[in-house]
């Protein structure tokens, strides 16, 4: 498989579906924001995308809703509609069409180059009522030991 690297700016995102169709690997370098904590660290981790042949609940996807690129987890699919939510978010979702999903994250890449497959987040999604406290502990722990 050939490597095709794409930066996560809006101008280059239009290339993602074409690169994936050509069988290339698309890596979004150092994603911004903290909405996917603790699984993807903004400004630190990169993600590798694959073609979105079948999107399912639990997948982490790159979507463009209303011209805005988002890397979040799928929490619901209803027909052709998909609902996303960041793992680090306590509330708020994004809704759009499945056709707006450009790619599925199949690897999370740390700065050391270590790759790991994203989990389905099933347990994390069920912890939504206590996620606020878990994220607070995570952030404090990270400040002390990072």
Question: What are the language-model segments listed below?
Answer:
Residues 1-146:
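Extended hydrophobic leader/signal-anchor segments used for secretion and membrane insertion
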């Amino acid at each position: 498989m050939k490597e095709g690297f794409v930066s996560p700016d809006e101008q280059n995102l239009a290339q993602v579906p074409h690169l994936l169709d050509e069988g290339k690997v698309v890596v979004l370098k150092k994603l911004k924001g903290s909405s996917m904590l603790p699984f993807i660290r903004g400004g630190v981790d990169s993600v590798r995308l694959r073609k979105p042949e079948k999107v399912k609940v639990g997948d982490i996807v790159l979507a463009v809703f209303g011209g805005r690129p988002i890397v979040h987890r799928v929490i619901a699919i209803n027909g052709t509609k998909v609902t996303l939510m960041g793992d680090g978010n306590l509330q708020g979702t994004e809704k759009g069409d499945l056709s707006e999903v450009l790619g599925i994250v199949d690897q999370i890449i740390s700065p050391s180059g270590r790759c790991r497959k994203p989990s389905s987040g099933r347990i994390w999604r069920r912890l939504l009522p206590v996620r606020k406290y878990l994220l607070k502990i995570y952030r404090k722990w990270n400040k002390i030991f990072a």
